[in-house]
Amino acid sequence: MKTIICSIALVVLALFTSAAFAQEAAPAQEPILTSAEAKFDTTTDNKDQQTKLDVYVKNSDGHEIAKSEGNEGRWNKNSTHTVTLQVEGSPMKGDVANGSVSLTLHPQRRNKWSFNYTVTLKFSDDTFITRGFNACYLTDHDPARTDSLK
């Protein structure tokens, strides 16, 4: 009888000990945004020298998560310019994927700029979100646009 009780005690002790030391696997961290860039292909109307461009990537709540402001210089017809955005904080991929891109033009005089553009977002797990937008334009009368990343 003593042997049976000792055996049961050992089994119970083993069960409680293994449960106490067992650890659940840590949940996988959601990837975070590590870099962002926007590539602009000017089409039929150039961007003037003094005209500045602001680029913002926003999360699903509309908060800025990457930006580049005051991009100036003449962007001629049929030219390509790449703008690197500064990432703010540690935005997660899920929030970014449902976000948007906002562009604002600050012309010093009359200006119409026609372009296509592509936004590339790189994450900590080496995945990318790339979205392209075609037949875009901004003018002194219509200086802003917002495009969805969905």
Residue ranges and their predicted role:
Residues 1-8:
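Bacterial N-terminal signal peptides that target proteins for export
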Residues 17-19:
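N-terminal signal peptide c-region/cleavage motif recognized by signal peptidases
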Residues 23-150:
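Regulatory, non-catalytic segments
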